[in-house]
Design a protein with these regions (language model features):
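Bacterial N-terminal signal peptides
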Residues: 8-19
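N-terminal "domain-start" segment that seeds a small globular fold
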Residues: 26-65, 133
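Boundary at the C-terminal end of the N-terminal hydrophobic targeting segment
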Residues: 21-23
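Thiol-based oxidoreductase modules, predominantly thioredoxin-like and allied folds used
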Residues: 103-117, 131-142
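Conserved redox-active cysteine motifs that mediate thiol-disulfide chemistry
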Residues: 77-94
Length: 187
């Protein structure tokens, strides 16, 4: 490993460690739950009855969201440059592991400008995170990537799908604690 790679790895680890502190300084507010009066964003999420995603995972496997029908799915758009996004990853992994054996999946879609950023992050994570905490990782710029969820002006942006594949909640910014209760109820 060259000195440059060691420096890059040290910087990435430092960024991961400092992410919670940075995220608390500028955490955007989540959208209200769907049982609240419908905002424009909530109405937009509800208008996407059955999202469709077709892609290759970052390890080259074909992926289609339709394969997860019958499961509760949390689809999160994120970026390695987003402190709030990186801050949420350990929470996502912990809950994913906690619901192992239940019909629950997480799909993380990196919106990084270049795939190498997502690959570098995954390489670091693969050294520290057990396999049972790993979920589907996709890069939105990969050849053949398609989704009908549109562009995301703010990250993270997450969609909660019920077992019928319909959007029941949309979150922008931090995923609130109530989201985990909602997921538990859907399971």
């Amino acid at each position: 490993m060259t000195n440059f790679h060691k420096l890059l790895l040290a910087m990435a680890i430092a960024a991961l460690i400092s992410a919670p502190a940075l995220a608390q300084q500028s955490a955007p507010k989540p959208l209200p739950p769907t049982n609240a009066p419908a905002s424009a964003a909530a109405q937009a999420a509800a208008s996407i009855a059955a999202p469709q995603i077709e892609a290759q995972t970052i390890d080259g496997k074909p992926f289609t969201l339709a394969a997860f029908k019958g499961k509760v799915v949390l689809v999160m758009f994120w970026s390695t440059g987003c402190a709030v996004c990186r801050d949420k990853m350990p929470e996502l992994r912990t809950n994913y592991e906690g619901w192992a054996g239940k019909p629950f999946e997480v799909v993380a879609i990196s919106t990084d400008a270049v795939m190498q950023d997502a690959l570098d992050y995954e390489r670091i994570i693969s050294r520290t995170v057990p396999m049972k905490q790993r979920f589907v990782q996709i890069w939105a710029g990969s050849p053949g990537y398609k989704d009908n969820l549109g562009k995301h002006a703010m990250l993270p942006a997450a969609y909660l799908l019920n077992k019928d594949g319909k959007v029941v909640e949309r979150y922008v910014g931090r995923i609130p604690a109530e989201a985990w209760v909602k997921i538990s109820d859907l399971l």
